[in-house]
């Protein structure tokens, strides 16, 4: 009997300790995850994608044997320094607002002579030998804006219209779960498991989130672009697949990129 009472007392004390420490444990775990990510930054595998993307940028490709030196990302043909920090933007030659990936595809098709099907055949790598040229190019181009202030030209009429459409989409509820982007990213203090969910309706949250994509995902062994991030959000909301390079994807990207204006770009980053 005494032995049983001792066991019961020990269990009661353990439960009490868990109850008292639970609030601290969650906070502590989040802090440790942040430290883990910070420690990994010095050896970010995204650099491998950046190196491959740089080689692709300077190498003549496609039927026309042309390099990306002729590709204008908004600051002049071949200029990559700071270009990503001002995307999406309106391109008169394409008569549309484009983000980085859609502009890269446009240059492949119109300047290098690559078919759109081949240019977009592998949009995202799968963690094996199936590698995406777009992800590598995006890694290189975005790395050249590291430390540059975000300045998406949201006052330009075409970009402004796309921004407003993206804002409407951000708050639009639908799908089998009646979710919107704001369901997960419209309030402070939300998380999925141990993952903090930034409040993208606030400037600080939007800046912190957008400026760290593309990112190397440790759990997947792949560099992921912002287009991939949007696709994965749609999947989790049980929405239909987001069409690559569609007006919907450009609109959402424009809205979120515009909300990040004023912050220094800090990617490609590393995430869980």
For each predicted feature, which ranges?
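Bacterial N-terminal signal peptides that target proteins for export
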Residues: 1-11
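Short alpha-helical "patches" and their helix-cap loops
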Residues: 8, 155-156, 268-272
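C-terminal segment of classical bacterial N-terminal signal peptides
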Residues: 15-24
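Electron-transfer interface patches adjacent to heme c in soluble/periplasmic c-type cytochromes
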Residues: 25-48, 58-136, 146-147, 172-272
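Short, charged low-complexity linear segments at domain edges
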Residues: 38-55, 148-167
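Internal, well-ordered alpha-helical scaffold/interface segments
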Residues: 135, 139, 160, 164-168, ...
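Hydrophobic, well-structured mid-protein blocks that either form specific transmembrane helices
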Residues: 137-144, 153-154
């Amino acid at each position: 009997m005494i032995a049983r009472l001792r066991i019961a007392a020990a269990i009661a004390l353990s439960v009490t300790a868990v109850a008292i420490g639970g609030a601290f444990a969650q906070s502590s775990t989040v802090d440790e995850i942040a430290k883990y990510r910070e420690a990994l930054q010095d050896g970010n595998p995204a650099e491998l994608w950046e190196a491959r993307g740089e080689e692709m940028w300077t190498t003549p490709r496609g039927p026309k044997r042309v390099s990306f030196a002729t590709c204008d990302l908004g600051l002049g043909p071949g200029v990559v320094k700071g270009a990503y920090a001002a995307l999406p933007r309106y391109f008169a030659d394409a008569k549309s607002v484009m983000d980085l990936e859609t502009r890269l595809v446009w240059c492949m098709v119109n300047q290098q002579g690559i078919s759109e099907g081949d240019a977009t055949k592998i949009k995202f790598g799968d963690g094996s030998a199936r590698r995406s040229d777009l992800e590598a190019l995006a890694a290189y181009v975005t790395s050249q804006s590291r430390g540059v202030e975000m300045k998406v030209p949201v006052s330009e009429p075409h970009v402004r219209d796309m921004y407003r459409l993206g804002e409407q989409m951000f708050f639009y509820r639908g799908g089998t779960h009646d979710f919107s982007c704001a369901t997960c990213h419209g309030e402070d203090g939300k998380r999925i498991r141990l993952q903090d969910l930034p409040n993208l309706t606030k400037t600080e949250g939007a800046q912190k989130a957008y400026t760290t994509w593309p990112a190397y995902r440790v759990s997947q062994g792949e560099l992921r672009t912002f287009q991939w991030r949007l696709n994965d959000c749609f999947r989790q909301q049980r929405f239909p697949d987001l069409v690559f390079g569609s007006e919907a994807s450009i609109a959402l990207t424009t809205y979120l990129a515009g909300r990040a204006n004023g912050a220094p770009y800090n990617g490609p980053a590393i995430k869980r």
